[in-house]
A protein has these predicted regions:
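Non-heme Fe(II) oxygenase catalytic core, chiefly the N-lobe of the double-stranded beta-helix
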Residues: 2-161
Length: 161
């Protein structure tokens, strides 16, 4: 097998701003493994990054990414610049799982984390984020995402200066 087949899906609460948000790409190839995913990324990197720019977020579904190490390999396959959590100078409590993969937050489940720009308070912040769900929450647990550019336009329309 030299590559994998993918399709675009729709999901609940998907929005449309001159393109769907988020875009959802599903792996349709039974028996695919991480090496097939890496080949697919190599062959489709330019399109995926262009789609990311257009749609604002991409949700990958059904890809064989089964551990933090697989996730690290998935992200590294894009060949993007990155940095370690320590380099970010953030003071949030997180644990490194690999050199460039760290937990999102170590707060107790009862603590709500509201919508925010990742590492906006630090001098070094990411231009792209990758999230991986290792274990889904038994209830709740959603990770809300927002098109900040669209939100700003909406706020300016509703509350002009």
């Amino acid at each position: 097998m030299s590559s994998i087949e993918t399709t675009e899906l729709t999901v609940d609460h998907q929005q449309n701003y001159d393109g769907v948000f988020p875009q959802v790409i599903a792996c349709d190839t039974d028996g695919a493994d991480l090496s097939h995913v890496q080949e697919w990324i190599a062959a489709n990197k330019a399109k995926v990054l262009n789609d990311l720019s257009k749609h604002g977020a991409i949700l990958f579904r059904g890809f064989p990414v089964l551990s933090d190490l697989d996730f690290d390999s998935f992200v590294q396959a894009f060949g993007l610049d990155g940095f370690t959590y320590q380099e970010s100078l953030s003071n949030a409590v997180r644990k490194n799982r690999t050199e460039k993969v760290f937990t999102a937050n170590e707060a107790p489940p009862a603590v709500s984390i509201f919508l925010h720009h990742e590492m906006a308070q630090t001098p070094l912040y990411p231009s792209k984020l990758f999230f991986y769900c290792e274990k889904a929450a038994e209830e709740g647990g959603a990770t809300p995402i927002c098109r900040s550019d669209i939100l700003l336009k909406e706020l300016e329309a509703r509350a002009p200066q």
